[in-house]
């Protein structure tokens, strides 16, 4: 394990243009090194801050930060916008849209923007009201890499140069637990390539900042331990986004370590030295260009005089109100108390209503936190480890292929599963190598779920993010294409919300998928955890209280939102956001174990409702697969698709043919699928017709000299006009037979070209 320290300094590479750059090396030991380089002064010179970030040589993006000169009026929040622009030229492709240009951001770009926003937003000084926009443009991307984590660092670096008041740079790193023959216990690898990700069983994206000046060591990440350097930089973890890989179950069966809570905690620790290195590089660049913080007018949410008056007026009433267990009753009482405070104090503080309301929220927050820290009770009367009452109803929607209702307290999620052919996979046109997705998870959060009105329509960024988290939690247990050749669309409807609808979606989805007959590798459940910290007692000792199954108010008033999903044996997905300057390792480990205990309790109740896949619904398509020789694929399809279209029309089945000769046949009725299978086999593996064979055929064409009869798919024979009338002479074929007629015929002759001559079979 290397303990060498990097001497990170910015270099003036073009004195005439004023171009500076700084480079940080990410040392992964046996897995090689990666280079992260920041450059400023060449591109986007009119932006307040602009940085070009490189991962090695071929992955390159431009991050710009710009701020309005005047604060935005009439708002009580910080107007930060983060946008990621994916350019198709970055991978040498022309967009596939009609106009051949990029349109609105895709899912990958939206998720990358959220990854940037979550750790960057808390670094801005409180009370800033100027509009700030961070735009990351992907200019070049190596197919072996991802750009999202590089974008976190680039966005932070450009913000450091913008003159905006921030607390310091943010570093982001992707960690993969790679398991191979040389590392059977796994090694955490920073900025892994896609090839290394294929060998991984778990991945983490960790973002954080250094809370005091340190000289970080160059990390090497050996083993599953801390894996990077011997010195411990004081890094505050601000965000974690993590998930198991889609083949983790098979890898564990082969002997790989399971990604348990302990392993996940080790991965977070292993990321810290790399974060410190990236923060040091950003600081070096900002120091070199002499980036000075400009003066901005700040708008604190309330004045101290207002807060003191609100506290004196409302504290006692809020102690009683925040002990009301029912959310609607509590919200109504809280709103009434706030309005009473406004009416009482507005004459004393004219034109400061917004401050009174903000101070009221702060007093409410203090009451909730004090009750948890000192009394050990939460808003609804639970202790720190109790889960709210659970309710489960399976097969709620009559014509859905699978459905389930999952309730946890006042949070209510409806999960609905739809199955279809593999050709219904979602087609992906993005910068990555993925071209399709078989398991699709959509999450909807209508305004009525919180008793409000609002816009409905296309999904917001939050809905896309929550759907992606639930999808990540379930992907590791979705059966393979070979075991279950279906496209699966899972929809989570948040019908009522009071805390962690995303983890409720994971539970509802497991139940719904089982109800649809999907043979999951293991059931998955999720739980949202919270954290409240403060000083208690006369000595002012720091106290950390981890909360299981947090309410919406506990999320808003607490210090951490920590969502964990998994099977009984390992973690499948994790998401962490914290407002603290770091969480002690033992507190994080305790939170993970507390989450596991809750998850096992929920899984047990889910198992009582449904413990294995149900039979598939009669309304769902039943898919069978057969294999045909590759040289027969063209014959099954026919000229311009004639043969396969004919089979589809005659049987009502949907047919998909893969390049390797695998044929998927889908039909709501089993008889249709069997009939289609017989017709395909008759073409691909036919019995060669011979003289004397009899068939009940269908007339497919009439001519002046006879009628063509279909014997097998793709094999027709001719009844000459002289053989149609028996002993009678007929003038027109159409006088005897028409297209579509069924005729019993016998093969009279097959010439050397394979053409078949038929005769009618006499009735006797």
Swiss-Prot record:
SUPFAM superfamilies: Eukaryotic type KH-domain (KH-domain type I), Nucleic acid-binding proteins, Polynucleotide phosphorylase/guanosine pentaphosphate synthase (PNPase/GPSI), domain 3, Ribonuclease PH domain 2-like, Ribosomal protein S5 domain 2-like. It comes from the Bacteria. Keywords: Cytoplasm, Magnesium, Metal-binding, Nucleotidyltransferase, RNA-binding, Transferase. Its EC number is 2.7.7.8. This is Polyribonucleotide nucleotidyltransferase. HAMAP family: PNPase. Residues 621-680 form the KH domain. Involved in mRNA degradation. Catalyzes the phosphorolysis of single-stranded polyribonucleotides processively in the 3'- to 5'-direction. InterPro entries: ExoRNase_PH_dom1 (IPR001247), ExoRNase_PH_dom2_sf (IPR036345), GPSI/PNP (IPR014069), KH_dom (IPR004087), KH_dom_type_1 (IPR004088), KH_dom_type_1_sf (IPR036612), NA-bd_OB-fold (IPR012340), PNPase (IPR012162). Pfam families: KH_1, PNPase, RNase_PH, S1. Its cofactor is Mg(2+). It is found in: Cytoplasm. One of its GO terms (molecular function) is magnesium ion binding. Mg(2+) binds at residues 555, 561.
